[in-house]
Structure formats: structure tokens, C-alpha cells
Amino acid sequence: MTLRLKQAFLHHTNGVEALRGVDLQIEAGEQVAIIGPSGAGKSSLLNMLATAIRPSSGDIEVLGERAWHLSARQRQRLRARIGLVHQAPPLPPRQRVVTAVLAGKLGQWSLGKSLINLLHPLDVPGARAALAKLDLADKLFSQCQQLSGGQLQRVGIARVLYQAPEVLLADEPVSAMDPVLAGHTLSILSRHAREHNVTLVASLHAVELALAHFPRIVGLREGRILFDCPSAQVSRDMLDTLYANEQLQSPAPAVTPLIVQIPRC
């Protein structure tokens, strides 16, 4: 299997229990959508699968490795095989799109090669090809601050496609896109995963998009998995229980501006 969680709990420092006894197995090449109301723990679950955060208790296995039993160096090598798409990609405003996309390989390059790439992009054709898949080839040398929220999200996706990971995790990857573009972008991700046998796991707030594009659906509420089944078996009653006291999201949420985060050195 590619991903496995066994009785995983996550307690934040403020006392909030984000995940409660999660058991989850995902095989190589599977495509899975995680749905649930705001605050259900979807982002926490994805970050745990990405080994970005350590479970408070329980066990996690990623690509055959017990991630938190590895040395820091070994875990860093493991992370280079995992791609994570952020809802708001942390792209410096003045960074050129070509540099942002090529950053997908930083975990696989030496320090010297990475520094050279900051001054002189080393694989312009590769970056252009990744952007072309998302209809953004014309933005290759634009600054990130010149792009819309939806375009920034697509740059983040292009960066992960260029990285070519074995596991692709996407946290609300189309939240700033209109319904048509959101569906088109998810189709691109799904096709890429299928053609390259990549394991794809995405959290989505838009239930209809999840049901339309993913064969397996995991319903998460208050840090617990309420159901895990083929999309064709997801019923209205199951969704009503999952989203009790919540309003189901339409095919894609209203476009909201993204805050571009500048990573600190």
C-alpha cells in the first residue's frame, strides 16, 4: 500500500483534537477525495499524510516507510517523493512563475543546483510543459503578483506536476476557480495520476466535484471518518449526516481572494 494510518490522533497545542483515531489505507494509484464540513480535519489529515506534521499518537506508513521512525535525512528524502498542493500556494509576489514551477524539484536537487536555478532557470522547457497542461504557458515569465487567485493555484499544481511525485496530495486545489475551470483542472490531475500511476488524494469542499471526479470518497467530520466508500454508494442521507447543521457546497465555492504567503528565511 502507498498510505496507511492506524489509530492516528492529532492534538493541537491549543487543546483542539483535530484527528481522532483515524484508520485509513490507500493503495498505489488510487484516487481519493476527502470531503467534510469546515473544521473537520481535512487539512490536518493531508498534512499528516505528507509527513508535514507528526501524529500525537498512532502510526503512519508512507510509501512503505514508517515516516516517524526514520532519521531526519531519510524523512527528507521520503518527502521528495510526495507532492503537496496548497490551497494558497506560498509564492513570493515578485518571484517569476518559471522559478516557482521549477521549485518543485528543489527536494531532488543539490543545494548548488538549487541556488543556480534561482538566478538562471535550469529547465525552462520543463516548466513551460507543466504550465501548458494547465493553459498557463503564456505566464511563464510573469511575476506571481500579476496572477489571479485561480492562476496561482494552477501554478501550484504545475509545480507539483513538474516535481513528478509518487503521491500527490491536494488541499482544496480549486477553491479559487470558477466551476468550469475547477472541473477541468481536476480532470487534468486525475488524468495525470492515472497515466503515471500516481496516488492522488484531494480534499474538496465542493461535494459535486468530489463525486464527479473521484471513484472513492472519504467523509470526515470532527476528526473522525464517518464513511469510506465508492462514490456511487454515497447517498443523500450519508451527506446529510456528514454535513449536519452545515450548508452543502455547490459545485465550486465562490471565488475568494488568496493571500500570497512569503516564506521566511
Swiss-Prot record:
Q: Where in or outside the cell?
A: Cell inner membrane
Return the broad EC class. translocase
Keyword GTP-binding assigned? no
Report the EC code(s) recorded for this entry.
7.3.2.2
Q: Which GO terms describe its molecular function?
A: ABC-type phosphonate transporter activity; ATP binding; ATP hydrolysis activity
Sorted alphabetically, which keywords does the UniProt record give?
Answer: ATP-binding, Cell inner membrane, Cell membrane, Membrane, Nucleotide-binding, Phosphonate transport, Translocase, Transport
InterPro entries per record: AAA+_ATPase (IPR003593), ABC_transporter-like_ATP-bd (IPR003439), ABC_transporter-like_CS (IPR017871), MetN_ABC_transporter-like (IPR050086), P-loop_NTPase (IPR027417)
Where is the major localization of this protein? membrane
What's the protein's topology in the membrane? Answer: Peripheral membrane protein
Cited SMART domains: AAA (SM00382)
Where in this chain does the record put each ABC transporter domain? 3-247
What is stated as this protein's family in its record? Belongs to the ABC transporter superfamily. Phosphonates importer (TC 3.A.1.9.1) family.
Q: Assembly state and interactors?
A: The complex is composed of two ATP-binding proteins (PhnC), two transmembrane proteins (PhnE) and a solute-binding protein (PhnD).
- List the PANTHER family: AMINO ACID IMPORT ATP-BINDING PROTEIN, PHOSPHONATES IMPORT ATP-BINDING PROTEIN PHNC
Q: What is this protein called?
A: Phosphonates import ATP-binding protein PhnC
Q: Which organism is it from?
A: Pseudomonas fluorescens (strain Pf0-1)
Where is the organism placed in the taxonomic lineage, from the top?
A: Bacteria, Pseudomonadati, Pseudomonadota, Gammaproteobacteria, Pseudomonadales
This protein's gene is called phnC
